[in-house]
Swiss-Prot record:
Name assigned to this protein: Aspartyl/glutamyl-tRNA(Asn/Gln) amidotransferase subunit B
Top class in the EC scheme: ligase
Keyword Ribonucleoprotein: no
Organism: Brucella canis (strain ATCC 23365 / NCTC 10854 / RM-666)
EC assignment: 6.3.5.-
Keywords assigned: ATP-binding, Ligase, Nucleotide-binding, Protein biosynthesis
Gene: gatB
Lineage: Bacteria, Pseudomonadati, Pseudomonadota, Alphaproteobacteria, Hyphomicrobiales
GO molecular-function term, one example from the UniProt record: ATP binding
Length: 500
């Protein structure tokens, strides 16, 4: 099958070499474990973290006479994912045997799909950026196919000095292999693609996307060429298990290939591994050593067939996907595309934000969730589900600012108190004397005191009105941040004779 080049060369994506510009071409094969209670062809549990070899049926262990039975839920999840990828759903697909030997593959073959996958071509839109002007670029990435297959078990080589062990708990777990077209042109695009793909499957509930647990991992195909030239020889980097590592692996591999070509060498088509400690790829095996998998239809499984009504019923019940949610947040709550992009990255974050923003100013809610809450969660190493501050509590803090009960500075202090101690924000403001000072007389005295203590600044402010902000800051400091900032600003300008 010939590969079609769908991208026009873009100079901003080029890599500068010693002999001129180069273009990197990237395709990805993402293995996503299907979210289901049981495995693809057996009733064994898929629970992560169980004791070794405790979630293994006779089918998973390939005992003689044991026949596979398709798990309908895995089929549903694959179709739902295909719909979410704007892809063609194939009403007939076939399971094939992929023949190779490995200790953690007890059957001696993997049940996969080769010529007739369950999902055909699709596409997703990624946002790359921001650039130095703060702008994002939307790029369409083609999906070649999605097929269902069995995961293999796990070989463990660190349990004994002279022996290796095999854990078959993962053997037979359903995988969706999602294959992109070679449309990616930079490590940034690859990271954005993998992030978007993970977001989509998490919204759909078809894969948990936990790369640290191995439930989502990527094989990355990398080649380089002169801009707009023929495709180069590609190398495949296997089983990269984090988005950050994907970017690092691509950057290293592209530079490695460029250095070889500029030295007059040739690229060997091979499989490589990424070493995250050294930040480099190393050879695993050459393609010349690769197996002839001898695919043929599995005689124990009939072709998988369903009708369009089955697909339509699943499509009708899909949740709101990230692109649609982002557009809705921008249109209904008036927030920026940038803020909306951050908020929809995780469904739980988007749900939290919408709970905070309900009945409130969308921009203020976005500012607090993105800058304060997510910043605090990141610092504490917590997920949004572990937030010590509930949407109701954060919403109450925003309400207190809008009502003029507390200033923005006091709100930050209140946020810290609620984060560390919990409690009702409104009661805490009362109990701890955090209310904003709105008594004009008290504020005026504070303004007079600051002006009297800084006669030199007064003269400077008359020539340079922007210095009024310095006086406002001093008054806020003197009142412990409790003075109404607007009242302070008006009084300072009035006292200094600065006109609006």
């Amino acid at each position: 099958m010939s590969i079609i080049d769908t991208r026009t060369p873009e100079p901003k994506r080029f890599i500068s070499g010693a002999t001129g510009d180069w273009e990197v071409v990237i395709g990805m094969e993402v293995h996503a474990q299907v979210t289901s209670e049981s495995k693809l062809f057996s009733g064994a549990s898929t629970a992560f973290g169980a004791e070794p070899n405790s979630n293994v049926s006779l089918v998973d262990a390939a005992m003689p006479g044991m026949l596979p039975v398709i798990n309908l839920e895995c089929v549903r999840q694959a179709v739902r994912t295909g719909i979410g990828l704007n892809a063609q759903i194939n009403l007939k697909s076939v399971f094939d045997r992929k023949n190779y030997f490995y200790p953690d593959l007890p059957q001696g073959y993997q049940i996969s799909q080769f010529k007739q996958p369950i999902v055909g071509e699709g596409k997703i839109m990624i946002s790359v950026g921001p650039d130095n002007k703060g702008q994002f670029e939307d790029v369409e990435i083609g999906i070649e196919r999605l097929h269902l297959e069995q995961d293999a078990g796990k070989s463990m080589h660190d349990q004994h000095p002279t022996m290796s062990y095999v854990d078959l708990n993962r053997s037979g777990v359903a995988l969706m292999e999602i294959v992109s077209k070679p449309d990616l042109r930079s490590s940034d695009e690859a990271r954005a693609y993998l992030t978007k793909l993970r977001t989509i499957v998490r919204y759909l509930g078809t894969c948990d996307g936990n790369m640290d647990e191995g439930s989502m991992r990527a094989d990355v195909n990398v080649s380089v060429r002169r801009p707009g030239g023929e495709f180069g020889t590609r190398c495949e980097i296997k089983n990269v298990n984090s988005i950050r590592f994907v970017g690092q692996a691509i950057e290293y591999e592209a530079r490695r290939q460029i250095a070889i070509l500029e030295d007059g060498g040739v690229i060997d088509q091979e499989t490589r591994l990424f070493d995250p400690v050294k930040g480099e790829t190393r050879s695993m095996r050459s393609k010349e050593e690769a197996h002839d998998y001898r695919y043929f239809p599995d005689p124990d499984l009939l072709p998988l067939e369903f009708d369009q009504a089955f697909v339509d019923a699943l499509a009708a019940k899909l949740p709101e996907l990230p692109d649609v949610k982002k557009q809705r947040l921008v249109e209904t709550l008036g927030i920026s595309v940038y803020d909306a992009s951050i908020l929809v990255t995780e469904k739980a974050i988007a749900d939290y934000y919408e709970a905070v923003a309900e009945g409130r100013d969308g921009k203020a809610a976005a500012n607090w969730v993105i800058n304060d809450l997510l910043g605090a969660l990141n610092k504490a190493g917590k997920d949004i589900e572990e937030s010590p501050i509930s949407p109701a509590q954060l919403g109450a803090i925003i309400d207190l600012i809008k009502e003029g009960t507390i200033s923005g500075k006091i709100a930050k202090d209140l946020f810290e108190i609620v984060w560390n101690e919990g409690g009702d924000p409104k009661k805490l403001v009362e109990e701890r004397g955090m209310k904003q000072v709105t008594d004009t007389g008290a504020i005026e005295k504070a303004v007079d005191d600051v002006i009297a203590a800084n006669p030199d600044k007064v003269e400077q402010a008359k020539a340079k009105p922007t210095l009024a902000g310095w006086f406002v800051g001093q008054v806020m400091k003197a009142t412990g941040g409790k003075a109404n900032p607007q009242a302070v600003n008006e009084l300072v300008k009035s006292k200094l004779g600065i006109e609006e």
